[in-house]
């Protein structure tokens, strides 16, 4: 959402918002340890995305590359995307059988706001890997998938 003339708010349409996110994802983000892009360039609804997180330093995740799937339904960005790890990971907010990030256990999804982005989700998941309850959890063998 942005402010229009006279302080009125303007709601950016879903597809424009996703195009902005696609452009930002293609340019690269921050320090390069998180990235994302569309799965299928022909999907006019821009629903299916792939994210990548490189595990943070000084944790059991260090140097590991995690692949995720993000699915933006028609209600995005009013409602958060569904987020699922493709790479196996052991984290408190991730279902150990399906790889789905549980919105009830992951604050950003639980308290979703329209202004949040897929980049925010990936950055926050990386931060979550560094928290005291996740940083030392025994991890599945590298390269295994859900």
Curated annotation (Swiss-Prot):
Protein family: Belongs to the ubiquitin-conjugating enzyme family.
Gene knockout outcome: Plants do not display apparent morphological variations, but are sensitive to the DNA-damaging agent MMS.
Induction description: Not induced by stresses.
Pfam families listed in its UniProt record: UQ_con (PF00179)
Entry-linked PROSITE patterns: UBC_2
The species this protein was found in: Arabidopsis thaliana (Mouse-ear cress)
TM segment ranges: none
Tissue: Expressed in roots, shoots, leaves, stems, flowers and pollen.
PANTHER family tied to this protein: UBIQUITIN-CONJUGATING ENZYME E2
Its job: Has no ubiquitin ligase activity on its own. The heterodimer with UBC catalyzes the synthesis of non-canonical poly-ubiquitin chains that are linked through 'Lys-63'. This type of poly-ubiquitination does not lead to protein degradation by the proteasome. Mediates transcriptional activation of target genes. May play a role in the control of progress through the cell cycle and differentiation. Involved in the error-free DNA repair pathway and contributes to the survival of cells after DNA damage.
Name used for this protein in its record: Ubiquitin-conjugating enzyme E2 variant 1D
Subunit structure: Heterodimer with UBC35 or UBC36.
Residues annotated as domain UBC core: 13-146
InterPro entries with a match to the protein in the record: UBQ-conjugat_E2_core (IPR000608), UBQ-conjugating_enzyme/RWD (IPR016135)
